[in-house]
């Protein structure tokens, strides 16, 4: 399940599909066509609100939308093995997308990779610059320097 379909999110979709995964994705902006074109299923929140801001970036959502969004994501988290979050709002804290209740609903052995940890994280339980496993067996990765940790591999791929 990919949350945030900007550059990093679309790359995560492409890599996940290449590895044979069934991919679901969401973004506050209307990018369903891009998500479908990459072979992923679009997850929609049953609430109408335009989340596009200036320059094609996301803007902050209303409280009512956030509530509907978090319930949609909680239900999705029950069914997936990995959640990759990439949602950010320039100059602001990363939006909270995955609540602790959603993490409690996930299967043991599931993983959350919070690429928005540098801005506080999209997951309520993310610990900045840490990896840990919750009581129910979900591993949460909150590194803020993930690309630097993979420098040798990234250089070899280049």
Role assignments for model-derived ranges:
Residues 1-76:
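Glycine-rich phosphate/diphosphate-binding loop of Rossmann-like nucleotide-binding domains
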Residues 52-83, 87-100, 104, 143:
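A structured beta-alpha segment of the ubiquitous adenosine-cofactor-binding alpha/beta core
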Residues 87, 115-116:
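Glycine-rich, N-terminal phosphate-binding loop of Rossmann-like dinucleotide-binding domains
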Residues 103-107, 133-134:
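Short, conserved loop/helix-junction motifs that constitute active-site signature segments
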Residues 107-110, 138:
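A short helix->loop->beta-strand "cap" motif at the edges of active sites that frequently abuts
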Residues 123-158:
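Adenosine-phosphate binding glycine-rich loop
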